Regions:
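Acidic, metal-dependent phosphodiester-chemistry machinery of nucleic-acid enzymes
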Residues: 18
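Sequence context surrounding c-type heme c attachment/ligation sites in exported
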Residues: 21-151
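Bacterial N-terminal signal peptides
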Residues: 1-7
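Sec/Tat signal peptide C-region and signal peptidase I cleavage site
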Residues: 9-14
Length: 151
């Protein structure tokens, strides 16, 4: 005699989704990890730094992968920025509400930055790597200037 266990066959409902503050926290963790990897690279590229290309490439590849995932941590329910509100730096968003009305641009920016980081991870020489990291820093700074509220 066979025993069958009935399992629901319907997709996850909204109540099965993480709370918006949990998603905001997750994206802050991911952004912190991107920043940490970028800091490692920029420290190696500083005048007093020592570039170990293989290590820097690994950091760039990690950044590329993280940037591919990053826009997916901005579901509409996390559009919660309010001017003048008291904020918990861990779970409250600083994302500009305009990000969601122009999400395609945000997604494109993250994709382009990911591709630059990937190209850096594949660079064969320091003189190829260095300008790509400069481009990546410019992309990061431009995206932050556009999409991050400072209140």
């Amino acid at each position: 005699m066979a025993l069958f266990i009935a399992a629901p066959m319907n997709p996850a409902s909204a109540q099965d989704q993480p709370a918006p503050k949990d998603t905001i926290f997750a994206r802050k963790i991911l952004m912190g990890a991107i920043d940490m990897n970028m800091d490692e690279i920029e420290t190696m590229l500083a005048p007093e730094g020592k570039l170990v290309l293989a290590d820097a490439q690994e950091h760039a590849e990690t950044i590329s992968t993280m940037l591919m995932a990053f826009p997916h941590l901005f579901p509409p329910a996390t559009n919660q920025w309010k001017p003048g509100a008291d904020r918990d730096p861990a779970t409250d968003t600083f994302a500009n509400p305009d990000l969601w009305s122009n999400f395609a641009d945000f997604y494109r920016r993250a994709t382009e930055a990911s591709k630059i980081a990937w190209s850096a991870s594949q660079a064969k020489r320091a003189d190829e790597f260095r300008p790509l990291i400069g481009q990546l820093r410019q992309r990061c700074d431009a995206c932050h200037a556009l999409n991050m509220k400072t209140d």
